[in-house]
């Protein structure tokens, strides 16, 4: 029987990436720099995981204003803006997520987050979408800079599994991106993928299931662990 479900956050629990993009752009404007990430550029930047890493990549190639602050400070300001936007209640969980989590809790299945986003972002999402602190929803939260290498490295999933004390063959990961799929499979997990707005163009070879919506799972019954791990 399945013992744990590990969730990515951005694009998986909720469609947050447009709000992240808005937070980046509003932060850039507040800092007085002529940077603006449109959807096409942001989609490309998302192939690099981690907000600080995206800013660094952007700075290596952009020809506009230089960075007004260290990257970590820019990212900190963006996180504060994102948390404020989340508090305005503009984001809802993706279809099927709330029911799956509720059913898993009733069944005694442990829940974890394994994400490259920061802990404050996870907390903001949980308070906005669940009305509770993250620790009241998830047994383990592996986030942000808790590991040295971000997805597609499997490190964040390995950390979550260690904290859960659950072997990968007794757990399943839910993801929305190719980097997330690679991270989950690298940790020995089965992985169910439902692409988000910014990842629908990606190829998901190796996914154990590929869904248009997590609502298609039909709850725990859809977490099929009978097939061997790819």
Curated annotation (Swiss-Prot):
Catalytic reaction equation(s): D-xylulose 1,5-bisphosphate + H2O = D-xylulose 5-phosphate + phosphate
Keywords per UniProt: Hydrolase, Magnesium, Metal-binding
GO biological process, one term: xylulose catabolic process
Effect of residue 10 to N: Loss of catalytic activity
Amino acids binding Mg(2+): 8, 10, 176
Listed cofactors: Mg(2+)
Key word Metal-binding present: yes
Positions bound to substrate: 8, 17, 50-54, 75-78, 115-121
Pfam families per record: Hydrolase (PF00702)
GO molecular function annotations of the record: hydrolase activity; magnesium ion binding
Documented EC number(s): 3.1.3.-
Keyword Transmembrane: no
Active site: 8 (nucleophile), 10 (proton donor)
Role played: Highly selective xylulose-1,5-bisphosphate (XuBP) phosphatase. Also shows activity towards ribulose-1,5-bisphosphate (RuBP) and fructose-1,6-bisphosphate (FBP), but not towards fructose-6-phosphate (F6P) or ribulose-5-phosphate (Ru5P). Degrades xylulose-1,5-bisphosphate, a potent inhibitor of rubisco produced by the rubisco itself.
Classification via PANTHER family: CBBY-LIKE PROTEIN, XYLULOSE-1,5-BISPHOSPHATE (XUBP) PHOSPHATASE
Annotated family: Belongs to the HAD-like hydrolase superfamily. CbbY/CbbZ/Gph/YieH family.
NCBIfam families: HAD-SF-IA-v3
Protein name: Protein CbbY
Organism: Cereibacter sphaeroides (Rhodobacter sphaeroides)
């Amino acid at each position: 029987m399945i013992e744990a479900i590990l969730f990515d956050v951005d694009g998986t629990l909720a469609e947050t990436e447009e709000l992240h993009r808005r937070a980046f752009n509003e932060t850039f404007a507040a800092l007085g720099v002529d940077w603006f990430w449109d959807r096409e550029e942001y989609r490309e930047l998302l192939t690099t995981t981690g907000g600080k890493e995206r800013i660094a990549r952007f700075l290596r190639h952009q020809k506009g204003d230089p960075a007004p602050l260290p990257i970590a400070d820019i990212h900190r300001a963006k996180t504060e803006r994102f948390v404020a936007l989340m508090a305005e209640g503009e984001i809802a969980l993706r279809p099927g997520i709330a029911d799956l989590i509720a059913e898993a809790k009733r069944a005694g299945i442990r829940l974890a987050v394994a994400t490259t986003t920061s802990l404050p972002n996870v907390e903001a999402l949980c308070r906005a979408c669940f009305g509770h602190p993250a620790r009241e929803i998830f047994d383990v939260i592996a986030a942000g800079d808790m590991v040295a290498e971000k997805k597609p490295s499997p490190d964040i999933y390995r950390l979550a599994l260690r904290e859960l004390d659950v072997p990968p063959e007794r757990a399943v990961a839910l993801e929305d991106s190719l980097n997330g799929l690679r991270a989950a499979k690298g940790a020995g997990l089965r992985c169910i993928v439902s692409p988000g707005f910014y990842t629908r163009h990606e190829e998901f070879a190796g996914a154990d299931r590929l869904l248009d919506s997590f609502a298609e799972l039909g709850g725990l019954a859809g977490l099929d662990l009978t097939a061997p791990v790819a």
